[in-house]
Swiss-Prot record:
Anthranilate 2 binds at residue 167. This is Anthranilate phosphoribosyltransferase. Binds 2 magnesium ions per monomer. Belongs to the anthranilate phosphoribosyltransferase family. Its cofactor is Mg(2+). Its EC number is 2.4.2.18. Catalyzes the transfer of the phosphoribosyl group of 5-phosphorylribose-1-pyrophosphate (PRPP) to anthranilate to yield N-(5'-phosphoribosyl)-anthranilate (PRA). NCBIfam families: trpD. It holds the Pfam family Glycos_trans_3N. Mg(2+) 1 binds at residues 93, 226. It comes from Mesorhizobium japonicum (strain LMG 29417 / CECT 9101 / MAFF 303099) (Mesorhizobium loti (strain MAFF 303099)).
Length: 336
C-alpha cells in the first residue's frame, strides 16, 4: 500500500510528474492499491500545486486503458462539460446532443449525475424516460439507430469505485473533474469540452492534442462550462495539431444576449420539462444557448464550415421536429 507514496512526495515538493509517472500513479489508485488517505493526499497535492498537461495526459491514459468501451460510428462526437461550475443551469450539452444528432451527426454522450448542479446529464435523461443502465452493445445500438447514446460514467469506468468515496469526502474539485470528459468510452476523436474555469482551457486543449484528438473546442463562457449567451465565451480550437484561441459573443452570430436567471434550472423533473419544451420549439435563452453549442458541435464534426452555418442547421433540426424525434427514439431503444 506504499507504492503511491513516492509520487505523493514528489508532487508535495512541487515537482511535476512525467506522463509515465502520472500513468503509473493513477494505475496504482485505480487498481485499488492505495489507501483513501493516500488518494486524498495525492489529489489535493495535485490541486494545490496545479495539475500539468503531462499529469492529466498520463491519468487519462490509465482511465482509457481501464474503461468499458462502446462501438460508435465513425465521425461520432461528444459534447460534455467538466461540471464544477456551480451554475445550476438547465442541461445545455445534453440538449445540444439531441440537436446535433438530429442534424445527422452521431453523438456518443458521456456524462454523470449532477456533481456541482442539481441535475446532471444522467439525472435529466432518467427523468425523460431514457434507460441509462444498459450494456455497451445496447448503447452502441442507440447511437447507430437513434443517433445518440448515453454512456453513464460510473458504469464505463468501474475502476473509479476506488476513488469515489474519497472524492465525495473531499467535496471539492479534483483532477478527476477533468479526466471524465477526456475519457470517452467510444473513443471519439472530435469533441467539445466545457471547463469550469478559463485557466483550464489551454491545458485541456494541450492534453487533447497530446492524446491525438483530431478536432476539438475547449470552452468556458461567463462562468459556465459551455458556450454561453450571457456574455463572452473563450474558446481554444484544436484542429490539425494546431491550437488557436478566440472569443465568441451571441450578438456576432445573430443571437440575443440573455441573463443567467433565464438559464437557471431546477430539479430533474423541471430540467426534463424544459429540455423537452426546447426541443419542441420553445423560444428563449435555452434554445439560443443550445443553438450556439450544437452549432459548434456541427463545426467540430465537419457538418458545418462556420458557427453561423452550424446554428442554422441546428435551428432546422429543432424546427423540423427531428430533435424531439431523436429523444423519443432514444427512450424507445434504450428501454427495448
Amino acid at each position: 500500500m506504499s507504492a503511491l507514496k513516492t509520487h505523493i512526495a514528489k508532487v508535495a515538493a512541487g515537482t511535476a510528474l512525467s506522463f509515465e509517472e502520472a500513468r503509473e500513479a493513477f494505475d496504482i489508485i485505480m487498481s485499488g492499491d492505495a489507501t483513501p488517505g493516500q488518494i486524498g493526499g495525492f489529489l489535493m497535492a495535485l490541486r494545490v500545486r496545479g495539475e500539468t498537461v503531462s499529469e492529466i495526459s498520463g491519468a487519462v491514459a490509465t482511465m482509457r486503458a481501464k474503461m468499458l468501451r462502446v462501438e460508435a460510428p465513425a465521425g461520432a462526437i461528444d459534447i460534455v462539460g467538466t461540471g464544477g461550475d456551480n451554475s445550476h443551469s438547465v442541461n445545455i450539452s445534453t440538449g445540444s446532443a439531441f440537436v446535433i444528432a438530429a442534424a445527422g451527426v452521431p453523438v456518443a454522450k458521456h456524462g454523470n449525475r449532477g456533481l456541482s448542479s442539481l441535475t446532471g446529464a444522467a439525472d435529466v435523461l432518467i427523468a425523460l424516460g431514457v434507460k441509462i443502465d444498459i450494456p455497451p452493445d445496447a448503447i452502441g445500438r442507440c447511437i447507430h439507430e437513434a443517433g445518440v447514446g448515453f454512456m453513464f460514467a460510473p458504469a464505463h469506468h468501474p475502476a473509479m469505485k476506488h476513488v469515489g468515496p474519497t472524492r465525495v469526502e473531499l467535496g471539492t474539485r479534483t483532477i478527476f473533474n477533468l479526466l471524465g470528459p477526456l475519457s470517452n468510452p467510444a473513443g471519439v476523436v472530435r469533441q467539445m469540452v466545457g471547463v469550469f474555469l478559463p485557466e483550464w482551457i489551454l491545458p485541456v486543449a494541450e492534453t487533447l492534442k497530446a492524446l491525438g484528438t483530431e478536432h476539438a473546442w475547449v470552452v468556458h463562457g461567463d462562468g459556465y462550462d459551455e458556450i454561453t449567451t450571457t456574455g463572452e465565451t473563450q474558446v481554444a480550437e484544436l484542429i490539425g495539431g494546431e491550437i488557436r484561441s478566440f472569443t465568441l459573443t451571441p450578438e456576432e452570430v445573430g443571437l440575443k444576449r440573455h441573463t443567467k436567471d433565464e438559464l437557471r434550472g431546477g430539479d430533474a423533473a423541471y430540467n426534463a420539462n424544459a429540455l423537452r419544451d426546447m426541443l419542441d420549439g420553445a423560444a428563449g435563452a435555452y434554445r439560443d444557448t443550445v443553438l450556439m453549442n450544437a452549432g459548434a458541435g456541427l463545426v467540430i464534426a465537419g457538418k458545418a464550415t462556420t458557427l453561423g452555418d452550424g446554428i442554422a442547421l441546428a435551428a432546422q433540426a429543432i424546427d423540423s421536429g427531428r430533435a424531439l424525434q431523436v429523444l423519443d427514439r432514444l427512450v424507445e431503444i434504450s428501454n427495448g
